Amino acid sequence: MLPRLVCISDYEQHARTVLQKSVYDYYKSGANDQETLADNIRAFSRWKLYPRMLRNVADIDLSTSVLGQRVSMPICVGATAMQCMAHVDGELATVRACQTMGTGMMLSSWATSSIEEVAEAGPEALRWMQLYIYKDREVSSQLVKRAEQMGYKAIFVTVDTPYLGNRFDDVRNRFKLPPQLRMKNFETNDLAFSPKGNFGDNSGLAEYVAQAIDPSLSWDDIKWLRRLTSLPIVVKGILRGDDAQEAVKHGVDGILVSNHGARQLDGVPATIDALPEIVEAVEGKVEVFLDGGVRKGTDVLKALALGARAVFVGRPIIWGLAFQGEKGVQDVLEILKEEFRLAMALSGCQNVKVIDKTLVRKNPLAVSKI
């Protein structure tokens, strides 16, 4: 009999017992000493909720829009690579769960299911494409064109990965894809991170990034991408207000405040702490989203109160996959949805439009006096 899991931490604890160690370590780990990994979650507790009373919360509407597309709730699925390591159906299970729940899924370029397979598995699902900029621009260009052809609704371009962060567990485990898997959006063994490729004796993914991803990425590449596609473009990985303003100048449609799940540069701020500066900097000109550390419905409420349009979750989806595939992902999303609904009700919010910054304040005890 399967255990009864009632919160996101339950799903993670279960995943640790069923996933191969190198796979669990890959999904769980952050960069270096993992200070930011812990802080992404811990930082939410530094923001305190100040609920409104006597607001008639008999009926709660969680729905909103993301880049002009309606979603049932402001909780979407972020790009998580190589999901077939967690469950045989991987990304196909995830997109089906998103379709059922009425929310969106961002597909990783490094998926173990192809752009086309995911579109066919979730034809009615709201799908977005995450993009890395490859040294060979034609590789990135083809990913964008395929996403357009298959009905994906936006491109989320990752800008925080000129090189891969130093993830100690991946080095210790000499992380590679299991032999039966490959990144299915690519044909050649080298681009597909196939076990048949040559990726060294340490972290194979770090070697892959060094071989394939362009470290000379600049704002000119955002212009190139803007010329390439008419789809909305979201820049993923912004943590500074001036970078956010530069992104707006270059014609992006959204900014995803992200530190890559704390997997790139250790010591950067938790995303919830970086969010207010970004929101202020863009002055409402583009939509702002957040990922990193979202584990509870109150986390979602706090992010929206600080100006996020929606949040994206990554690791919780993997833990759901590891538990029960499509149903596990759906259950994880349902938990977050119902926690968010309750948090809204207890805060006096009938719909997402009334969620504003008056609902949250930084705990004064958490502010350094240095």
From Swiss-Prot:
Binding residue positions for glyoxylate: Y26, Y132, R167, H260, R263
Pathway named in the protein's UniProt entry: Amino-acid biosynthesis; glycine biosynthesis
Residues annotated as binding FMN: 79-81, 108, 130, 158, 236, 258, 291-295, 314-315
Cofactor section: FMN
One GO term of the biological process aspect: glycolate catabolic process
Function: Broad substrate specificity (S)-2-hydroxy-acid oxidase that preferentially oxidizes glycolate. The glyoxylate produced by the oxidation of glycolate can then be utilized by alanine-glyoxylate aminotransferase for the peroxisomal synthesis of glycine; this pathway appears to be an important step for the detoxification of glyoxylate which, if allowed to accumulate, may be metabolized to oxalate with formation of kidney stones. Can also catalyze the oxidation of glyoxylate, and long chain hydroxyacids such as 2-hydroxyhexadecanoate and 2-hydroxyoctanoate.
Name of this protein: 2-Hydroxyacid oxidase 1
Organism name: Rattus norvegicus (Rat)
